[in-house]
Amino acid sequence: MTQIGMMLAIMALGVPMSAQWPAKTPGIPRTADGKPRLSAPAPRRPDGKPDFSGLWEHLNARTSAYYLKDIAFPWQPSAKALFEERKANNQKDNPEGQCLPRGLPKADAFDIHKIVQTPELIVVLYEYGTTFRQIFIDGRALPTDANPSWMGYSVGHWEGDTLVVESNGFNGKAWLSFEGVPISDALHLTERMRRRDFGHMDIELTIDDPKAYTKPWTTELHPELVPDTELIEFVCNENERDARHLVGK
């Protein structure tokens, strides 16, 4: 299988489509003809904080590594060598080819996901693999010995209307892109999240991973609200047809 063919197979495997739902999403501002007015002001919770709740996706999420475009990675030599090895081997060890989680921040960049916000906790539900993430906003500190996992351990605090989320405790197995840009278990991820208006969010990501990169670097995500639909169940192993073909060179 060629590298391009294998990449297309993984992307088809890993990007489910959201369902057309029989009912309109309540609480969304609409025009006179019933269309969602996504430029309306961002909603707020009773305490005045921005409310990130809703179903979100990136319009260009089905292209490969768009959020890493034009970044000059400050590679550690070992991470650069690992990246080149993955490319040379046609990305055959991509975790998604084995129906494993995407991890962060790739899941936020590529998956349609639902944010459920409460005063002390934000839960993110991802359609791909029916995975989830918790962001604790109850004032707790980021632990120094979190149990290693695909999605890490996340705590958040408010700086005005910006939610600042700090995450660690990653297992280092996830890829940042389909091409194989690596992270390690030393990753410290910082996300600065703003809901610009009702239908648009801006997220600044800072990747601080001294095992993989010589200095921190940043990129951005700009998800859009997906109205009038809901998540559907997506069980990767029930649909998986491609892992047997991911044999590399």
Regions found by a protein language model. Name each.
Residues 2-3, 9-10, 15-249:
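PEST-like low-complexity, intrinsically disordered acidic/proline/serine-rich tracts
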